[in-house]
Amino acid sequence: INDNLMQQAETLYRYLFIKNASPKWRTGSMAELVSVRYGKDHKKLADGTIPVYGSGGVMRFVERPLYEHESVLIPRKGSLNNIIYVNQPFWSVDTMFYTEMKLCNVAKYVYFYLKSQNLAAMNVGSAVPSMTTELLNSLQIKIPSNSTLMMFESIVDPMFKTISHNQIEIKKLMQVRDYLLKKLFS
């Protein structure tokens, strides 16, 4: 179900912003839509309930967030194409950028835009794949009308909320399964 919802949201993104992009939309830079921020070291934080994201996904849970708002996480080192959308308090490690939105209703647009880019091909590292804020900030992106962004948000936000709810339910069901299996085999 979650994959299907994400595919629907991505299809809508392509339909609205690629196939039917308005010629009136100007081309701008990513820096006009988001501020790209560096993640920070997490090793001195105590365990808690806040997810810590690295380029491979959630690494652990800590006591406090680095950022508490909607964000798009972009790998700085490693798996450069593993773009992550987050809409809950989180911590981002120092090998992962996070973004602060400068405009309303742009996070999911930016998420799908970045997923459509081959960031791995923009690698500036030698031994380890690497990304820079300068490169991300300079990415050329169409700046859609506010009404188009609002319409997109109103359609895909419920999809993202359903995905989030489903992920919580899956985690609970896995815990029940593990408990029951443990009882069955003990």
Where is each model-derived feature located?
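Non-catalytic DNA-recognition/assembly elements of restriction-modification systems
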Residues: 1-54, 142, 146-186
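DNA target-recognition domains and sequence-specific DNA-contacting regions of bacterial/archaeal
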Residues: 26-144
